[in-house]
Amino acid sequence: GMAKAQSVRVARTETGRALSQAGLDSAMVAKDNGINMKKRWYATKDTRTRDTHRHLDGTSVDIEDNFHSSGCVGPAPKLFVGVASAKENINCRCKLLYYIDEDELPTVMRTKEDGVIPFTTYRDWEKEKRKGSA
């Protein structure tokens, strides 16, 4: 059998994959009904976020377009395919924000350490953190 830590990791990853696919499926139904949506990658703002997902944070694409990372391609977090897809998908905490107009996007976000702060990309958040600790 599997060790407990491994089974928790698999359950967390597969639950996340199902949620990610469900969100994508819902957005595709909206598109099929004439609603033109976009999707924006949203990475968790903490030091555990993998480097390959930090650069995707804040990237917007059309609903049927893919994101690219480490030679892998996928329509949403936890849905990458390719030679390194396990490294891209396992324990990923990223999400997508679906929207019609840019002005619908959030203006604030919550981080574990800072509470509610102005909405920012991972890279800008990281720069602010470095400035604050200097």
Name these PLM-found stretches.
Residues 1-5:
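Short, basic interhelical loop/turn and adjoining N-cap
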Residues 12-134:
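Activation/maturation switch segments at domain boundaries
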